[in-house]
Amino acid sequence: MGLILSAVTFGGVMKWIGFIAIALLCLMFMIVVHEFGHFVVGRLLGFKVDEFAVGFGPAIFKYTSKKSGVIFSLRCLPLGGFCGFHGENDEEDKPLTKDNFNFHKPWKRILVFIAGAGFNLLSAVVLCTIFFMAYGDMMPKVLMTYQFENGIEQNLQEGDLIIAVDGKSLYSTAVPNDLANRIQKHSDKMNVTIIRDGDKQDIVIYIGDYLSTNAENQVIESRGLGISITYEEYRFGFIESLGRSFVFIFKLFGTIFTSIGAVITGALGVGEAMGGTVTAIQQIAMVSQIGFRGVLFAVCALSANIAIMNLLPIPALDGAHVVFTTIEWVRGKPLNRKVENIIHTIGLICLFALAIILDVVHFVS
C-alpha cells in the first residue's frame, strides 16, 4: 500500500516537473523573441550589439561572429535572455563614440525599444493563426429545436453549425456569448451562415417565443431561436485564421486596458488583475495538462500581454525608455543619464518586488 502510494505520488510529482519545464521553456521563448526583436531592428539600423544571450548565468556555449563581432551565447539558467547593446548604460561622463547606443538618433533608439514588443505581438499573431488553423474556433451547433408558439417553422436543423450572423463571422474564443449578443440586436429574424452536412449555406432564421425545459425538467417559456446548442470545433483556412487572430488580440488588448483602468480607479485589486513570473509559469503549467493546444493558446495570450505591458511608461520597461528618449528628442539634448539610470534601477527593483508580492498573494489565496 505504502509502495503504491509512493509510486503514484512520485509519478504525479514527475508529471508536474514536466509541466513546469514546459512552462519555463515557453516563458523563455517569449522573452527571447522579445530580445530578438531588439537585436534585429538594432542591427538593421546600424547599432553595435556586444552580445545576444539565451538564458542567464554562466555561459555553456559561446560563438563570436567574425562578420559583426556579436557574441552569441547559451547560458545555464533557462529564464529568458538579453540583447546587450554597446554602451547602452553608459553615463554622461563617458565620451560617446559612433558605436555607442546613445550616439544614434532618438528616433532610431525608439524603434529599437518598441521592437521587442513588436516581435512579441508578431509572434502572437503567427501563433494565434496557427492555433485557429490547427484547432479552429468553437462554433455553436444545434442540438435540439423547439416549436415556436406562433407556429412559424424554424429553418435550423439538428447538427447545423452556425458560423456567421449577417455575413459577419462568430468569434467564440475572442467574444464569449457572441451568438447571444448578436441575437439581442434583432427582433424577429436574422441572416446566418451555417454548415449543414458539410455544405455552407446562407439562411434566414427566426426569433420568437417557445416552450423548453430547464435543468430541473420544468417547462418554461423563453424567447430566442428556439434551439438548444453545444459547441464544436470548426477549423479555418489561413486568411480567416489570420483575421481571427487580429480580432482575438484586439479584444485581449481591450481586456488588458480595462483591467489596468479598474486597478487605477480602485475597482479591481492589483493582485486580482496581475501576477508575477511564478504565476505565469503556474498558468502555463496548468494548461499544459490539456496538451499542445492549451500551451499554444496560453503562449498566444501571454505574448500579446507582454507586448502591451512592456510598452507601459513604467521605469525599467521599454515604454519608459521610449518616454525618456522622446523627451530628449523634443529638448534636443538628453536628460541626465545618471539620474535616468537610477530611475530605471529603482523601477526594476520595484517591479521585482511587486512580482514577488503578487506571486505570494496568489499562492496564499
What are these regions (language model features)?
Residues 293-307:
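Small-residue-enriched transmembrane helix starts and helix-helix packing motifs
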Residues 2-13, 93-107, 115, 119-269, ...:
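PDZ peptide-recognition modules
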Residues 15, 19-23, 104-113, 120, ...:
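Residue-level signature of transmembrane alpha-helical entry/exit and packing/kink sites
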Residues 61-65, 143-148, 326-342:
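Membrane interface segments of multi-pass transport proteins and intramembrane proteases
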Residues 21, 25, 115, 119, ...:
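Lipid-exposed faces of alpha-helical membrane segments in multi-pass integral membrane proteins
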Residues 3-6, 18-95, 302, 309-331:
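Small-residue-rich helix-interface/hinge motifs
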Residues 357-365:
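Juxtamembrane boundary at the C-terminal end of a transmembrane helix
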